[in-house]
A protein has these predicted regions:
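Short, structured patches in soluble enzyme cores that scaffold and shape functional sites
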Residues: 88-91, 115, 140-143, 161-163, ...
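Aromatic-lined glycan-binding groove of carbohydrate-active enzymes
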Residues: 133-135, 142-148, 184-188
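Internal, well-ordered alpha-helical segments in soluble enzyme and binding-protein domains
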Residues: 91, 107-110, 132, 148, ...
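Catalytic cores of soluble, metal-dependent hydrolases
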Residues: 1-58, 65-69, 75-79, 151-277
Length: 277
């Protein structure tokens, strides 16, 4: 699909695992902490390397992969002297720390880790550069734990839950955020979780939450991102093919990516957006 849109595409293959070191935390609910810590390090290095002269698209996996992608991209942004912004499209903010997560599922911590929240030192890889929480926009939230709500407010993350989208519409909320990115000449990473979408159109995810983005809302987000010319990297995460219905969730994720990368019904004036992916 991307090739048909005129983009040069190279499959970089799977990230290679690195040795796992023993890590023990007082929160005994944490699942696979040593393994995810090791994968975070490996993915971070891969993201840093892949973002040198191209727009990387990272395929998960659950959302824990974004602890690695975002931290690696933040390091790249710091090396180029530009700020990294993150658009987090998700039913959940994934803003737990290792201490606050009751489930122990580490796909609930990546945004807290990548933004430099406390409690990860000694357990996750050190952060060469953290994302400024005020440059993070979460959109589509509809399942937020009390500890996450407090942390989001204290950190200053931009939060647009589904009520805000219902009240104001998704376009003006996204337009305001993109204006901030543009004003600071920032790099923009988009992290798209399948559960951002309503489960009626995207059932292939293990963490479905009713009331998500509609088909047209999701495509509008991608079309606006494409028009902006600001996106520098992309996560596609949480797709579970075993839960899909004749591949319709996978097809939708491909179509959304195509909208982000320039597929449109009619031509519109946009900023130049071309290169290798």
């Amino acid at each position: 699909v991307l090739s048909s849109l005129g983009h040069a595409v190279e499959d970089m293959g799977a990230v290679q695992a690195i040795p796992v070191r023993r890590v023990v935390h007082r929160n005994l609910a944490l699942k696979a902490l040593p393994e995810i810590s090791a994968w975070t390090s490996a993915i971070s290095e891969a993201a840093y390397a892949a973002s040198e002269d191209a727009m990387p698209i990272f395929l998960g996996g659950d959302h824990s992969v974004s602890a690695g992608t975002v931290s690696g991209l933040a390091r790249r942004a710091a090396a180029t002297g530009r700020p990294l912004f993150v658009l987090w499209l998700d039913a959940h903010p994934d803003f737990h720390t290792l201490d606050t997560t009751a489930s122990g599922n580490l796909h609930g911590v990546p945004l807290a880790y990548a933004s430099g929240q406390q409690g990860f030192a000694g357990y996750f890889p050190d952060l060469p550069a953290a994302v400024d929480p005020s440059r993070i926009c979460t959109m589509g939230l509809r399942s937020v734990d009390p500890a996450e709500r407090r942390a989001l407010n204290e950190a200053g993350v931009i939060v647009h839950d589904m009520r805000a989208i219902d009240e104001h519409g998704i376009a003006p909320l996204l337009r305001d955020f993109l204006a901030h990115v543009s004003a600071e000449a920032g790099l923009l990473h988009v992290s798209l979780d399948v559960d951002f979408l309503d489960p009626s159109i995207a059932p292939a995810v293990g963490t479905t939450v009713p009331g998500g983005a509609t088909f047209r809302e999701a495509h509008l987000v991608m079309e606006m991102l494409s028009d902006s010319g600001l996106v520098s990297s992309l996560d596609l995460v949480e797709l579970n093919p075993f839960l899909d219905e004749r591949g319709r969730t996978a097809t939708l994720m491909v179509d959304l990516t195509a909208s982000l990368m320039g597929r449109r019904i009619m031509d519109r004036p946009t900023r130049s957006h071309s290169g290798s992916f």
